Design a protein with these regions (language model features):
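Extended, non-globular alpha-helical segments
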Residues: 53-77
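Short hydrophobic core segments
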Residues: 29, 37, 48-59, 93-94, ...
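Feature captures the FAD/FMN-dependent oxidoreductase FAD-binding
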Residues: 1-51, 147, 154-163, 178, ...
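Glycine/Thr-rich phosphate-binding loops of Rossmann-like dinucleotide-binding domains
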Residues: 27, 64-66, 102, 107, ...
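Short glycine-rich hinge loops at helix-strand junctions in the catalytic core
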Residues: 59, 111, 143-144, 202, ...
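FAD-site-proximal beta/loop scaffold in flavoenzymes
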Residues: 71-87, 178-221
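Rossmann-like dinucleotide-binding cores of NAD(P)H-dependent redox enzymes
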Residues: 4-14, 82-83, 88-92, 98-176
Length: 221
């Protein structure tokens, strides 16, 4: 049902763009100059397009910390979770940001046992304290989620079961090894800016983020 819904939305958006006069090209894009974009089509054919302005809107990718191995089935990111074809009885969610909270809400509603693992000394560490208190009461406490803070998932090994080495965040000493049916890695997202040939234009990123001015123009060295 979810896949069908996504296909319908994608088709409707495509039609809306085409009605607005937008030309849609499919392939892998890269910068070839200040007003030039290279495109590698699915067939392997390379093209170069000229444009007055170029907007970089490549989105983001899930961040997977060192030590965590994903296989897309028993250990997976939020991108892969929406296409998961099975329901784990017990799932550990690494990270307690908005993505982790959303999926914890979904999995508990589906009857899964959920353990939430947060490296910081409290869950939802980046939230406003008042919002975190309300969210914790409604999304964690009321759902009987086992939320653990101050623990670093220093190693995650896919399998049946998945093994998680939990270490004290400060000392890095092993606390316990947890065995669960699945692990969702929800430790944030990073800019999807690799492979755009930014360096050829003198654009230096900061952890993947593009430098911009007050009008959102990319800064070039």
């Amino acid at each position: 049902h979810a896949n069908q819904l996504v296909q319908t939305i994608r088709a409707n958006l495509t039609k809306s763009l085409e009605r607005a006069g937008v030309t849609i090209l499919r392939g892998q894009g890269r910068l070839e100059g200040a007003q030039r974009v290279g495109l590698r089509e699915p067939s392997g054919v390379d093209r170069v397009l000229n444009a007055k302005d170029v907007i970089i809107a490549t989105g983001s990718d899930p961040f997977v910390p060192p030590g965590i191995e994903t296989d897309g089935r028993t250990v997976f990111t939020s991108d892969e979770a929406i296409n998961l074809e099975w329901l784990p009885r017990w799932i550990a969610i690494i990270g307690s940001g908005y993505i982790g909270l959303e999926f914890a809400d979904v999995y508990t509603a589906l009857g899964c046992e959920v353990t939430m693992i947060e490296a910081m000394d409290k869950v939802m560490p980046t939230f406003d304290p008042d919002i975190a208190k309300i969210a914790g009461r409604h999304l964690i406490d009321s759902r009987d989620i086992d939320a653990r803070s101050g623990l670093l998932a220093r190693k995650v090994t896919p399998g049946c079961p998945v093994q998680i080495e939990l270490a004290d965040f400060n000392s890095r000493e092993l606390v316990e090894t947890l065995e669960v049916d699945a692990v969702l890695v929800a430790t944030g997202r990073v800019p999807s800016s690799k492979g755009l040939n930014l360096e050829s234009l003198g654009i230096e990123t900061n952890r993947g983020f593009l430098p911009i001015d007050d009008t959102m123009r990319v800064l070039v060295n």
